């Protein structure tokens, strides 16, 4: 069998690579490697000109494998794979060597070592490329319907957007009513619109839409399957129900921290949260006299290091509403996070209406004590550079949004991750900001992280668009990088099933393991743990990895 003809394309990436790696020397070295028929350098291999040069070289030199030495495959591999296919080379006969992130950027002060390392990485990539095999991507049918878990604003907007495109949607909401946390708001920032003016028309559209089915007082109990074919089990008002959908959207929202034990909350009825103040404002029951608000009550701490993002805006909005009722208002803050032009204007409006802002230091938080004639708030404020004592008739705590109580249970059911704070975590913050690593499942709203209504709705429309793509196509192609079980060697021990994080392996009628192609992500955990060596990882076979390892040990 003749060795495949390999082409190597080394990218200068402007100065990102060329300033630290001797690219011409690397190209000349690549030409000496076994199987390499052609090698060249490009200023930007990912540019239209660079891609056209790859296609021209494939045709002119009858190349059968392609290696690009440039930046990260995470961002650019799909682009180069498409280029290879356009020139008649199977996309799985392509290999990348990351000589930017893993070489030039690491060794900016060592150009000679950077050049030698670039040669090593290319030698390894060429060794693997020589053993690559074409891959076929299986297609699977997609059920053109969606499940939205959560009936808050983001869940309802996502459901409406999908339903308006002609797809059936089921909303599963655990509470008695749709609306989520917005039900507890009196008005919305930054335009002080009544929450009911937003919520009531939205709920009416959802409940009367012919394509949307709403199940309240319902929870998801089981999820099995893969993109295009998820089997859902729910408990709907005490009754079990099962149905099938093609995509899933997680929009379970978040909860507001109940800060018991913090600043006398739960001990003195004059201490309430911003959410509780909203309800008092709606009922017209705000105490007369002086109102003091404390920001970051329970957030930006060791236990919850994140900023909840909406707290400052909510506090400023409520401070304005309280000031308009003739109350004196103080806002005690660490850093006032009224981001964006509208919220900044809201802050300026609050100052014009007499709201006073005093900064406090994180290491010296306010001290609150109670007496029959009022609350006393003591702090050192760098704003006035002295200790301050305020008598308060009412103390308002700005508490953060926290993950819902059943987030962990749902994440395990869906096989999707949570971040260190307990919120649902996207596949990639820049490249796939609303997708999970598990295909066909998406996240939006405060289930993902604390955010305002505008951002939640933007994410909801984004996930609706993403979820609609496979449903509109009716079929999806899965990657050929997956595991394959040699059932003549499989002992049926089930170790691979136990370790697979995606539930992508099951036992067949003979009790032997088999891969579910649509679910497998090619992570390789099963292949690494199989005691019988019965599992092959396509595109990352033992032979290919060993060839790379041996190439790494060769002298450049």
Language-model regions, residue ranges each:
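Mid-to-C-terminal Rossmann-like scaffold of FAD/NAD(P)H-dependent oxidoreductases
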Residues: 2-6, 152-155, 334-373, 450, ...
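Flanking helices and flexible, charged tails adjoining ferredoxin-like Fe-S electron-transfer domains
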Residues: 2-6, 183-208, 212, 236, ...
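Beta1-alpha1 glycine-rich phosphate/pyrophosphate-binding loop at the start
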Residues: 2-63, 67-68, 72-103, 144, ...
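Cysteine-centered iron-sulfur cluster-binding motifs in ferredoxin-type domains/subunits
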Residues: 10-20, 115, 119, 148-163, ...
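Rossmann-like dinucleotide/flavin-binding elements
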Residues: 49, 59-61, 104-109, 114-122, ...
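Iron-sulfur cluster-binding cysteine motifs and their immediate structural context
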Residues: 71-74, 163-177, 211-216, 225-231, ...
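Ferredoxin-like iron-sulfur electron-transfer modules
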Residues: 133-149, 153-154, 183-194, 226-241, ...
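A Rossmann-like FAD-binding core segment of flavoenzymes
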Residues: 193, 199-255, 320-406, 507-508
């Amino acid at each position: 069998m003749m060795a495949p003809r390999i082409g190597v394309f080394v990218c200068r990436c402007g100065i990102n690579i060329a300033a630290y790696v001797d690219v011409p020397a690397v190209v000349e070295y690549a030409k000496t490697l076994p199987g390499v028929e052609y090698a060249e350098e490009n200023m930007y291999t990912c540019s239209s000109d660079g891609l056209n040069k790859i296609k021209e070289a494939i045709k002119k030199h009858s190349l059968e494998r392609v290696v690009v030495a440039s930046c990260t495959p995470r961002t650019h591999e799909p682009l180069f794979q498409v280029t290879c296919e356009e020139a008649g080379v199977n996309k799985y006969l392509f290999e990348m060597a990351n000589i930017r992130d893993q070489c030039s950027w690491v060794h900016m002060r060592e150009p000679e070592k950077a050049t030698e390392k670039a040669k090593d990485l290319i030698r390894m990539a060429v060794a693997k490329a020589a053993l690559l095999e074409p891959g076929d991507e299986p297609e699977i049918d997609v059920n053109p319907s969606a499940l939205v878990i959560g009936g808050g604003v983001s869940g309802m907007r996502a459901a409406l957007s999908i339903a308006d495109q002609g797809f059936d949607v089921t909303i599963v909401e655990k509470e008695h009513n749709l609306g989520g946390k917005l039900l507890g708001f009196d008005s919305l920032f930054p335009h002080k619109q009544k929450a009911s003016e937003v919520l009531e028309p939205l709920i009416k559209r959802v409940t009367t839409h012919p394509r949307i089915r709403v199940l309240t007082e319902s929870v998801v109990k089981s999820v099995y399957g893969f993109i295009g074919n998820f089997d859902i089990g729910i408990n709907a008002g005490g009754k079990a129900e099962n149905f099938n959908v093609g995509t899933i959207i997680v929009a379970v929202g978040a909860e507001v921290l109940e800060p018991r034990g913090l600043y006398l909350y739960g001990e003195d009825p004059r201490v309430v949260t911003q959410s509780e103040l909203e309800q008092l404002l709606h009922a017209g029951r705000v105490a007369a006299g002086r109102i003091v608000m404390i920001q970051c009550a329970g957030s930006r701490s060791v236990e919850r290091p994140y900023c909840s993002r909406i707290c400052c805006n909510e506090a400023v909005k409520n401070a304005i509403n309280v000031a308009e009722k003739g109350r004196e208002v103080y806002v005690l803050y660490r850093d006032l996070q009224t981001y964006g032009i509208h919220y900044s204007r809201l802050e300026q409006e609050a100052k014009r209406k007499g709201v006073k802002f005093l900064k406090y230091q994180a290491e010296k938080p306010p001290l609150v004590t109670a007496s029959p004639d009022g609350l006393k708030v003591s702090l050192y404020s760098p704003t006035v550079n002295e200790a301050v004592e305020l008598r308060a008739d009412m103390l308002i705590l700005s508490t953060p949004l926290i993950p819902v109580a059943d987030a962990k249970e749902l994440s395990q059911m869906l096989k999707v991750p949570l971040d260190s704070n307990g919120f649902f975590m996207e596949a990639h913050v820049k490249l796939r900001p609303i997708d999970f690593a598990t295909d066909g499942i998406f996240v939006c709203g405060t289930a993902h992280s604390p955010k305002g209504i505008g951002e939640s709705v933007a994410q909801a429309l984004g996930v609706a668009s993403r979820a609609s793509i496979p449903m509109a196509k009716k079929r999806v192609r899965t990657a050929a990088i997956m595991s394959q079980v040699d059932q003549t060697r499989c002992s049926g021990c089930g170790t691979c099933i136990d370790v697979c994080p995606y539930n992508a392996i099951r036992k067949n009628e003979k009790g032997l393991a088999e891969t579910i192609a649509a679910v497998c992500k090619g992570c390789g955990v099963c292949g690494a743990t199989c005691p019988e060596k019965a599992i092959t990882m396509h595109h990352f076979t033992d032979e290919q990895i060993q060839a790379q390892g041996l190439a790494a040990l060769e002298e450049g």
